[in-house]
UniProtKB/Swiss-Prot annotation:
Residues 156-183 are annotated as: Disordered. Keywords: Cell membrane, Ion transport, Membrane, Signal, Transmembrane, Transmembrane helix, Transport, Zinc, Zinc transport. The keyword S-adenosyl-L-methionine does not apply. One of its GO terms (cellular component) is plasma membrane. This is Probable zinc transporter 12. InterPro entries: ZIP, Zn/Fe_permease_fun/pln. GO terms for biological process: zinc ion transmembrane transport. PANTHER family: ZINC TRANSPORTER 12-RELATED, ZINC/IRON TRANSPORTER.
Length: 355
């Protein structure tokens, strides 16, 4: 029953993303109406490339997620370099790919100049709100796990009142921070089960941010009538999904999910962009991505996704990796992780030229 509920939740999340996009983009055409495509031959040619994109992106997504999950040992130094690379990829996805897309949508001339559009930085506001919400979800989830664990052990949370007691707890916090444990609950000793559970929460929120963007780019590609637009997007989005999958796969591997859960998360990520392409193909005749409501919906979704990914990359991936004891005690590991982070961010940023 629990698995069934989780499946329903996943389907509900997809519907929340897809349905508003389709309804808003099918409204009456306005002065900013999108192109309707050309001849039947051009549409047939475009369809052929869309089918190629469907399978290419699907395979790249599966391969990207599977490589760190099934091909690497999480205890090795090399896995740390992979995590740094993955963090760079996710950070660049948020800053270079998704945030500019959101800004373009929410500052479009098609929305007019009346408040809150025009000069107001709506994209930054939404991204900031998403980051704060992500932090609150993590904080409350972590607090709930701590209270549940301590309740089972018949203990209560320690409360600092100053003086020696506060100093003792602070010292404990420093010890845990230096050992690379969670940054979120420094006053509370955390066992391995709690740390693993927190990693699972982080990974699931991260996948949500990635999936939202994957659906949007899939629908956009599937609805595009232009062969000249689709051709470069195939390669760009294929590598985009490969690198994103690589980043997500590293987090899934470290979170130690059960095998069935791993496969569910793997397929949930790998199928979202291809499903988006399929939906885009089906609604290509009515889909107008330049309608005001479609711009608002896609802009808000992209801004939300960027806020989630930027927060997760910096707070939950980069900071714990670079501040843990193993990295800090070895110049070789520190330099290698730094290079991997820059390479991951650089390669993902480079893809923004084409996608």
């Amino acid at each position: 029953m629990s698995r069934f509920r989780k499946t329903l939740v996943s389907a509900f999340v997809l519907c929340l993303v897809i349905f508003p996009l389709l309804v808003s983009a099918a409204e009456e055409e306005n002065q900013c109406g999108g192109s309707k495509g050309g001849s039947a031959a051009e549409k047939a040619s475009a369809l052929k490339y869309k089918i190629i994109a469907f399978f290419s992106i699907l395979i790249a997504g599966v391969f990207g997620v599977c490589l760190p999950i099934f091909g690497l040992k999480t205890e090795s130094n090399f896995f740390m370099y992979v995590k740094a690379f993955a963090a760079g990829v996710i950070l660049a996805t948020g800053f270079v790919h998704i945030l500019p897309d959101a800004t373009e949508s929410l500052t479009s001339s098609c929305l007019g100049e009346e408040p809150p559009w025009g000069d107001f930085p709506m994209t930054g506001l939404v991204a900031m709100a998403a980051s704060i919400l992500t932090m609150l979800i993590e904080s409350f989830a972590s607090g709930y796990l701590n209270r549940s664990r301590l309740a089972k052990e018949g203990k209560t949370l320690p409360v600092s009142t100053g003086g020696e007691e506060e100093h003792a707890h602070t010292g404990s916090a420093h010890t845990h921070a230096s050992q690379g444990h969670s940054h979120g609950s420094l006053l509370i000793p955390q066992d391995d089960d709690h740390i693993d559970m927190r990693k699972k929460i982080v990974t699931q929120i991260l996948e949500l941010g990635i999936v939202v963007h994957s659906v949007i780019i899939g629908i956009s590609l599937g609805a595009s009538p232009s062969v000249s637009t689709i051709k470069p997007l195939i390669a760009a989005i294929t590598f985009h999904q490969l690198f994103e999958g690589f980043g997500l796969g590293g987090c899934i591997s470290e979170a130690k999910f059960r095998v069935k859960k791993i496969w569910v998360m793997l397929m949930f990520f790998a199928l979202t962009a291809p499903i988006g392409i399929g939906i885009g193909i089906g609604v290509a005749e009515i889909y107008n991505e330049n309608s005001p409501m479609a711009l608002k919906v896609s802009g808000f979704l992209n801004a939300t996704a960027s806020g989630i990914l930027i927060y997760m990359a910096l707070v939950d991936l980069v900071a714990p990796l670079f501040m843990n004891q193993k990295t800090q005690s070895s110049m070789k590991i520190q330099v290698a992780c730094s290079v991997s982070l820059v390479v991951g961010a650089g390669l993902m940023s480079l893809l923004a030229i084409w996608a």
